[in-house]
């Protein structure tokens, strides 16, 4: 398998931070964080295998451990031995897997709307998204995505922006087979019995109105990790790093800047 597309930004002497996006897989998800992070950190972004600028057919059994190996390969390509890892949803699962598989490569961990085992509510959402993709194709899947990501009031206020984002997502849709394989990887991730082995400083972030991943799942994750703290936003949805970037960035920087 070929190398993944990645980019490095920020001061050469800054502490490295790897950003790993969610199901969509595109590095651009973290655009609202880049200015704040690159002012002081050496930030590595990348597109997951099979998405964005990292094309390629996924093996049917492509899973989170394979994605964690990809993330380590990105660090290798960037010449970075150890980095803090910030991951949204699937990216957060990758961060946890990296901490388990290669603990010396990982500094601090940030898990945004993630989990240690799939929640029944999340399973229901994924079943609905698979049905939308099967019945309506890529356009229906992409248009429905915003309902799972954003609060209704924000979605209403940002309708033009969302439509532009949807056009971009549809133009770069990775294909149904890739999307379904990545959803299966999310559904198969289960490390509840291994959380005690993750001693890294960890920030678990969530929004109370996330309809895709209940915030209670983040509460349980933070409670089970030996060295974790929880940051709950009152609102913002599954993509609260996008809908409430100022508050999100403050909480993120407060954690990453700790001595």
From Swiss-Prot:
Species in which this protein is naturally found: Methylobacterium radiotolerans (strain ATCC 27329 / DSM 1819 / JCM 2831 / NBRC 15690 / NCIMB 10815 / 0-1)
UniProt-recorded name of the protein: Putative carbamate hydrolase RutD
Coiled coil: none
Example of a GO cellular component annotation carried by this entry: membrane
Biological processes per GO annotation: acylglycerol catabolic process; nitrogen utilization; uracil catabolic process
EC number: 3.5.1.-
MF GO annotations: hydrolase activity, acting on carbon-nitrogen (but not peptide) bonds, in linear amides; monoacylglycerol lipase activity
Record-linked Gene3D superfamilies: alpha/beta hydrolase
Domain AB hydrolase-1: start-end pairs: 16-118
Keywords on record: Hydrolase
